[in-house]
Amino acid sequence: MEVRPKEGWNHADFVYCEDTEFAPGKPTVNADEEVGGPQICRVCGDKATGYHFNVMTCEGCKGFFRRAMKRNARLRCPFRKGACEITRKTRRQCQACRLRKCLESGMKKEMIMSDAAVEERRALIKRKKRERIGTQPPGVQGLTEEQRMMIRELMDAQMKTFDTTFSHFKNFRLPGVLSSGCEMPESLQAPSREEAAKWNQVRKDLWSVKVSVQLRGEDGSVWNYKPPADNGGKEIFSLLPHMADMSTYMFKGIINFAKVISYFRDLPIEDQISLLKGATFELCQLRFNTVFNAETGTWECGRLSYCLEDPAGGFQQLLLEPMLKFHYMLKKLQLHEEEYVLMQAISLFSPDRPGVVQHRVVDQLQEQYAITLKSYIECNRPQPAHRFLFLKIMAMLTELRSINAQHTQRLLRIQDIHPFATPLMQELFGITGS
């Protein structure tokens, strides 16, 4: 490098991001491990990171010395004839004096590795890193211990509170026959204009989808229920008692799931109630999705099966119903159990539920679970096809939130003309009276 006149000398010609360019490998001795605590760079006084080329220095001076020696540059001091003070702030101002200070401190050119040795060392470090990662169980690379603990707790809660075989779902009401148990409410047989309007809306809510039910007995017998043809409206109410029993059974499992989670138990009881009232239906649908067979349009709940009846408009007509579209779209993502339970946690810890007091605490918990879900996906689904999976899941949760609001309004309209909700349903959905 040529020495320029004082007035035109540009130090940037020699220095290239000296404070961010690290030599490969680690120093043999960490500066913080020295007796007496953190050490300072013998060249410029900055915080040292260890011994580099025989001297305790910072990363900046280490990189500077290595580059200067490799370039074999001829430098002259443009200021004070070789007497510049080298500090953290002035080390870039005079390269000649900085190099002199490096040599006077004891830095040795012969300790600089050749380019070939550097590449060999880098390859060795990468190989050891790959070997170290390969010894870890699948699914834990990149996850912190706290995140692994959170997933374990959620999986444990799910296992303890979700009866995937529905073997404990007993003593439920089956759909009634047309002659008993499903007559049109008396108030609607000669309705007023207001009652007729309510009835038409309920009819629209319920008639968009028909569901058949199959029950397999322990003795091998099979009981089938198929929704009857339109018979003046009374057939609409036949499934309500059974669905109320199934919903109540699922809601109890959701409540117990939340109680297993330590972060949930730490919240005030008022916030626990508010979160459960807001999220129980959403968590219930996430669990139902795990037993949904998208190929047959059937929820396989142990001995019970619920199958969608093809409407006149065919399969595409079903997808116009937001709830059904949600189940098909979510099932298409082919989620892991861990991803399902993390979705449940994100839904449960929603800080904007009505009545929540500790918004910040709940918001932080939701963020932790969301970050854990993102990390889990990055660790377990590195394929390009899954690079948008986290965003898709969060979009599904947003859609589920909207469906929850619609469902609550539907339920209240039905309850208003034909009370069917169980006490637990009334508590969760804020239904007063019967």
From Swiss-Prot:
Q: Where in the cell is it found?
A: Nucleus
Q: Which InterPro entries match?
A: NHR-like_dom_sf (IPR035500), Nucl_hrmn_rcpt_lig-bd (IPR000536), Nuclear_hormone_rcpt_NR1 (IPR050234), Nuclear_hrmn_rcpt (IPR001723), Znf_hrmn_rcpt (IPR001628), Znf_NHR/GATA (IPR013088)
Keyword set includes Zinc-finger: yes
Provide the residue ranges listed under DNA-binding region in this record: 38-107
Recite the UniProt keywords alphabetically: Activator, DNA-binding, Metal-binding, Nucleus, Receptor, Transcription, Transcription regulation, Zinc, Zinc-finger
Example GO molecular function: estrogen response element binding
Q: Which residues form the NR LBD domain?
A: 146-433
Q: Where is this motif: Bipartite nuclear localization signal?
A: 66-92
Q: Where does hyperforin bind?
A: S247, Q285, L286, R287, F288, H407
Does the record bear ATP-binding in its keywords? no
Instruction: Report the record's Gene Ontology biological process terms.
Output: positive regulation of DNA-templated transcription; regulation of transcription by RNA polymerase II; xenobiotic catabolic process; xenobiotic metabolic process; xenobiotic transport
Q: Spell out the residue ranges making up region: Hinge.
A: 108-145
State where the NR C4-type zinc fingers lie: 41-61, 77-102
GO-annotated cellular components = chromatin; nucleoplasm; nucleus
Spell out the family assignment given in the record's similarity comment.
Answer: Belongs to the nuclear hormone receptor family. NR1 subfamily.
What is known about its subunit structure?
A: Heterodimer with RXRA. Interacts with NCOA1. Interacts (via domain NR LBD) with CRY1 and CRY2 in a ligand-dependent manner.
Protein task: Nuclear receptor that binds and is activated by a variety of endogenous and xenobiotic compounds. Transcription factor that activates the transcription of multiple genes involved in the metabolism and secretion of potentially harmful xenobiotics, endogenous compounds and drugs. Response to specific ligands is species-specific, due to differences in the ligand-binding domain. Activated by naturally occurring steroids, such as pregnenolone and progesterone. Binds to a response element in the promoters of the CYP3A4 and ABCB1/MDR1 genes.
Name of the protein: Nuclear receptor subfamily 1 group I member 2
* Gene that specifies this protein: NR1I2
